[in-house]
């Protein structure tokens, strides 16, 4: 009988899109599976993925992930053509697809990839329905973050 691998906390995340939370208000999040090829799974296990410029396009009743880069390994099979920027189909329920279509058809909404992670043996992508932030919204977020840090610093020093 084989031993189970020790699970390292935090090791399930492959890639994060930190820029998405800075540039968009995330209204709702969904978890979607990815339709991948064999070399892509190997590369994801090695952590060779980037989703910072990725977005989701809805067409023909399906959702596709565009702009995600999965860099092929050097030892990848030579008889398979490896396209690191190819569009990948997202695996969602029909109810979730309908919800995405309804929200994206509203003014100013888009769907962006937030994170790429492992759930058991399956690769999942967390996508979010987002609305773009204006420059003043970004500045107010920065002010709030700085105030939170200052408040924590003041409370820490007040106890001394």
Swiss-Prot record:
This is SsrA-binding protein. Required for rescue of stalled ribosomes mediated by trans-translation. Binds to transfer-messenger RNA (tmRNA), required for stable association of tmRNA with ribosomes. tmRNA and SmpB together mimic tRNA shape, replacing the anticodon stem-loop with SmpB. tmRNA is encoded by the ssrA gene; the 2 termini fold to resemble tRNA(Ala) and it encodes a 'tag peptide', a short internal open reading frame. During trans-translation Ala-aminoacylated tmRNA acts like a tRNA, entering the A-site of stalled ribosomes, displacing the stalled mRNA. GO terms for cellular component: cytosol. GO terms for molecular function: RNA binding. Pfam families: SmpB. NCBIfam families: PRK05422.1, smpB. It comes from the Bacteria. GO terms for biological process: trans-translation. It is found in: Cytoplasm.
